[in-house]
């Protein structure tokens, strides 16, 4: 009698139990044609059904400055680092935000702050 209720609860909370992508390290370096942003992510990729699928660079006001798509799972490469070059960061900003996502859970709720050295 209680088994259907328990099964329904487990199914309803399954995605909430999944681990979100975590920014392990990040830096932004100025260059001749914009900034290069390097982000190291950790995520328990399981394969094509659940993997870290990208990250975005945001201004403090939430405006998107860049997006790095991750096109395949990194099951055996954790954590892993990817770069995005040519990011135009407006003068006057002292930091940007990095927000990763995964194919199952979407965007993480709290982005990671990266201070800029100009």
Predicted segment positions?
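Edge beta-strands of extracellular beta-sandwich domains
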Residues: 106-116
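Sec-dependent signal peptide recognition
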Residues: 1-8
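A short, structured loop/turn motif at beta-sheet edges
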Residues: 30-33, 57-64, 88-94
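Short, solvent-exposed, Trp/other aromatic-anchored flexible loops in extracytoplasmic proteins
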Residues: 66-106
């Amino acid at each position: 009698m209680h088994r259907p209720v328990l099964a329904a609860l487990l199914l309803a909370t399954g995605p909430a139990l999944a681990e979100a992508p975590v920014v392990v390290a990040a830096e932004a370096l100025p260059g001749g044609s914009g900034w290069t942003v390097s982000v190291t992510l950790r995520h328990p990729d399981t394969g094509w059904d659940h993997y870290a699928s990208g990250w975005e660079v945001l201004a403090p006001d939430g405006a998107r400055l860049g997006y790095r798509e991750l096109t395949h799972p990194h099951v055996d490469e954790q954590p892993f680092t990817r770069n995005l070059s040519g990011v135009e960061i407006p003068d006057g900003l002292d930091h940007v935000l990095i927000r990763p996502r995964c194919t199952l859970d979407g965007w993480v709720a709290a982005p990671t702050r990266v201070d800029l050295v100009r």
